[in-house]
Amino acid sequence: MATVTSESEFQHMLRVCNTNLDGRRKVPYALTGIKGCGRRYAYLVCKRAGIDVNKRAGLMTPAEIEKIVDILNNPLNYKIPVWFLNRQKDNKDGKDSQLIANAVETRLREDIEALKKMRAHRGLRHYWGLRVRGQHTKTTGRRGRTVGVSRTKGA
């Protein structure tokens, strides 16, 4: 059953974790706009926060938004299982965490730089601009690379 709300209470755009979210979408699907938060994780966050999954994101109160942000930043405090997190047994500190927003891109870039620095096979493939995950490269992936041809003097 839909409730009628005044236009002043509804937020068309929400700012959560440095990301603009569409207030017209339902809460879990709006949360998927945050990098590092997929559909299953968004549903779990809504369940832990006690927010109705059929509610529109623009109708959330500031307290509910704060609760969601706290769960996104500290998932282990809300009994979200370790296997659900996107960063398990971190190479630097060995901790389990959920990376969201800009931290995902930053950590990925740091991981690739570390692979390059230690001269691992994957790091070298990244450095050379080749496929990393074992794909064949004889016939595919030729765009962008050119081989110079030298002309012969004569005729």
From Swiss-Prot:
GO molecular function, one term: rRNA binding
Keyword tags: Cytoplasm, Ribonucleoprotein, Ribosomal protein, RNA-binding, rRNA-binding
Alphabetical list of PROSITE patterns matching this protein: RIBOSOMAL_S13_1 (PS00646), RIBOSOMAL_S13_2 (PS50159)
Region (Disordered): 135-155
GO cellular component, as recorded: cytosol; small ribosomal subunit
Any Gene Ontology biological process: translation
Places the protein is found: Cytoplasm
Pfam entry (one): Ribosomal_S13
Lineage: superkingdom: Eukaryota
PANTHER family linked: 30S RIBOSOMAL PROTEIN S13/40S RIBOSOMAL PROTEIN S18 (PTHR10871), SMALL RIBOSOMAL SUBUNIT PROTEIN US13 (PTHR10871:SF3)
Free-text function comment from the UniProt entry: Component of the small ribosomal subunit. The ribosome is a large ribonucleoprotein complex responsible for the synthesis of proteins in the cell.
Name recorded for this polypeptide: Small ribosomal subunit protein uS13
